[in-house]
Amino acid sequence: MARGIFITATGTDIGKTYVTALIIKRLRETNINCGYYKAALSGAERRDGKLIAGDANYVYNIANIKGDPNDAVSYIFQQAVSPHLAAKLNNVEISMERIKKDFYSIKNKYDYITVEGSGGIVCPISTGKKKIMLDNIIKIFKLPAIVVADAGLGTINSTILTLQYMKEKNISVKMILLNNYNHEDIIHIENKGYLSDNLLIPVYTCNKNANNLEIPVEKLIEIYEEI
């Protein structure tokens, strides 16, 4: 049976894709067959008449995943707006059935699957005939989660608010990862210490522009759960 994890963040442009790529890369370097999936992506580039799923393309390149990155994303939009608005602008009805079909297709190819969210945890995927929130996708696939947060000023507030929302939605958070971490920045050091001391969730860091995660592979494997 495959194992999975969901990567979310405290907001947009925090570094979900970057962290996701490094996690998958770390596992694949130890011969773990780990794949990638994303339900909806906006802000795609158009090349030669085709939309390119930039996040997926980045992950595939960094983690050395073979195949077409676009196949790992159910809905790809050019406009750099939230998925529900992009769907409106393109007259597209986002379907949970298609998301499920694509997810299970990816799941059948890999032993481990890493699912990346869109924006922060409170993200409308569809406001059409059937309302879909990001947390609906997490719960349907019974995925635990990693929360990516920026290491800098304000992260205590945004991280705890994110965790509170996820607790209300009964989503299991396995790890907090502080991105852009600087070991010499007193704010970063204090933020990590505060979160570590006040939460019952492991807190790890990712240095800015790091090529690898300084997290033991065993710890990463532990947080993936059977799905």
From Swiss-Prot:
One of its GO terms (biological process) is biotin biosynthetic process. Keywords: ATP-binding, Biotin biosynthesis, Cytoplasm, Ligase, Magnesium, Metal-binding, Nucleotide-binding. It catalyses: (7R,8S)-7,8-diammoniononanoate + CO2 + ATP = (4R,5S)-dethiobiotin + ADP + phosphate + 3 H(+). Mg(2+) binds at T17, D55, E116. Pathway: Cofactor biosynthesis; biotin biosynthesis; biotin from 7,8-diaminononanoate: step 1/2. Its cofactor is Mg(2+). GO terms for cellular component: cytosol. ATP binds at D13, I14, G15, K16, T17, Y18, D55, E116, G117, S118, G119, N179, N180. The active site is at K38. It is an enzyme of class 6 (ligase). The keyword Transmembrane helix does not apply. Substrate binds at S42. Its main location: cytoplasm. It is found in: Cytoplasm. Its EC number is 6.3.3.3. One of its GO terms (molecular function) is dethiobiotin synthase activity. Homodimer. Belongs to the dethiobiotin synthetase family. Catalyzes a mechanistically unusual reaction, the ATP-dependent insertion of CO2 between the N7 and N8 nitrogen atoms of 7,8-diaminopelargonic acid (DAPA, also called 7,8-diammoniononanoate) to form a ureido ring. This is ATP-dependent dethiobiotin synthetase BioD. It comes from Clostridium botulinum (strain Okra / Type B1). The lineage of its organism: Bacteria, Bacillati, Bacillota, Clostridia, Eubacteriales.
